[in-house]
Amino acid sequence: MSSDTSSSRPPQPDSGTASKSESENPAIPSPKPKAHAPLTNRDWWPDQVDVSSLHPHSPLSNPLGDDFDYAAEFAKLDVEALKADMISLMTTSQDWWPADYGHYGGLFIRMSWHAAGTYRIHDGRGGAGQGMQRFAPLNSWPDNASLDKARRLLWPIKKKYGNKISWADLITYAGNVALESMGFKTFGFGFGREDVWEPEEILWGEEEEWLGTDKRYSGERELAQPYGATTMGLIYVNPEGPEGKPDPIAAAIDIRETFGRMAMNDEETAALIVGGHSFGKTHGAGDADLVGPEPEAAPIEQQGLGWKSSYGTGSGKDAITSGLEVVWTPTPTKWDNSFLETLYGYEWELTKSPAGAWQFTAKDGAGAGTIPDPFGGAGRAPTMLVTDISLRESPIYADITRRWLDHPEELADAFAKAWYKLLHRDMGPISRYLGPWVAEPQLWQDPVPAVDHELVDDNDVAALKKKVLDSGLSIPQLVKTAWSAAASYRNTDKRGGANGGRLRLQPQRSWEVNEPSELDKVLPVLEKIQQDFNASASGGKKISLADLIVLAGSAAVEKAAKDAGYEISVHFAPGRTDASQESTDVESFAVLEPRADGFRNYIRPGEKAPLEQLLIERAYLLGVTGPEMTVLVGGLRALGANHGSSKHGVFTDRPGALTNDFFVNLLDMGTEWKASETAENVYEGRDRASGALKWTATANDLVFGSNSVLRGLVEVYAQDDAHGKFVEDFVAAWVKVMNSDRFDLK
């Protein structure tokens, strides 16, 4: 049925409740930060770099200890018994939080979706991989109202199976089981998410109040990076429309932007909304002012539960979560095509929920009584969210959803794959997945081939190192190439890294930070060494270019250490393979391109953020600590590994030798630093007595002398007895970065 003007863009009334999200976000009062006198160093000096951000999840906070092996514990788990217990849980309604329609499936789908849906592509943060929904701020986000009850319902399962199943896996798996228990065939499931035990500081937005939007947009509604959501405290978008204005077309624009930032294309986006909204309901039975504070602000006697409502019984038929009161289909506990049949089967008019939230109801009383009440009351009229109507009104989504209306099997396939991607997007390569239900590799998992040949041995490694060092390539060239390959790694979502050899492929081959013109000189030489070895090696031995790039860089580090008077062997573990261009999603990889890399003293033209802050961010994404960051920067400067062979920060008269000169000369009080009058982002270090120019630097360099924490680390490596320690620590940090994506070694 084609839509008429009643379901096109409605008039723009004042927002009833602007505090909503996709699909259950509260109209209830949201938390606001309480003002207080400065209590921390960060309060006093907010512009100082926060080195402590490089040390999240201290092992001191982990009650399971350093020796705990989750994969080994999981191997003891009877996954079929777990699944059976969870299916039983789905249909065992509890008096303290009754199940809609006698089935918790809709609630658990929302819990899993909101755990995974925090993932964002621009920095890889968020996602379900660590069970962060248990902690602030996520446990108290307006969008996560009532999910405290969902997690509490899971406690008997967690209690029974103990350390064999993590909270992170259990929270995520619950939604998968919910779908299967209601007749949907999922694409698979991978376990393997390890719990953390304390929250992590993540910049979710700069707004000073939850549900704000004023600090994340500029220009014509341009959403700042790296944010994924339109609104502070929401997972995706406001289901009443942008800022609570019920405009389905404008909402579709927000949907496309925010789901795209979660790595979903248009079809995946539509599939997730249609599939997710085929089950359950939203909750807005009464006045939202009767709902109490979120878990982090709730009274101690509520024991971690929040949003206690005094409206009626406060639960069941009286539940208030989002302020929206929508049941999407006549079969809310069964998979079928009734969401689209309902969406296209009626014309829609704008109405308000009992809590005053904007939603749509079938026009002129059509369909009255066809939607079942969750607790046996009178039948209801069909209802939809503003963002549901977007799927019909937006030409982009209408083309997709109208096709699925006639071909429900295509919807089922698209939803199964999009749901699998949603739950696993932050887990990295498939080698990290556990359990019997892991699906075949997908392009978005950045697949690499399995090793199908004998690996090089110690004698081969020694011979290859000699060939590399005799090739005419310089130490800086070899070091920079290896760093370019490995430093694409993001510890947040476990993407990038040297494995796969994608430095030779697009888009990484063309990234400015990787100096394409230099790669054009280095890679052909290494490829020739690889080809010659593979053609002549006996016993089926081969070396991948991915392995050789790392080996060549490590050989250069050994040579540089020797030139500085220190003999050391850099550990090398073969086993990387070379991916193909066909198995590399160019658009997906593009978001890994660094806006800055302080380790190479690189900044993208036009970047305005402080360099020292970007250095900390790059170190965080690499997963290195403050001491590791310090020793790596000092060592890479000594090796001459700057982007474009810049001399900034190369505080040595013997570049290419692995010395601690960077630290010694940075602390030299005979040097006075001033901002350059001719070059942006550059500082000049001049002799205090003569005024002669000695060095140039950027904030990436000088922060190590300016910041008190970093200066303390620099002092360790600048001491007269520190050269040996410096080399050993640099090599250890180097190997860590080179092996960041070698999950087979961990």
From Swiss-Prot:
Coiled coil: none annotated. The keyword Lipid metabolism does not apply. One of its GO terms (cellular component) is cytosol. Gene3D superfamilies: 1.10.520.10, Peroxidase, domain 2. The record marks R110 as: Transition state stabilizer. CDD domains: catalase_peroxidase_1, catalase_peroxidase_2. Homodimer or homotetramer. This is Catalase-peroxidase. It comes from Mycobacterium intracellulare.
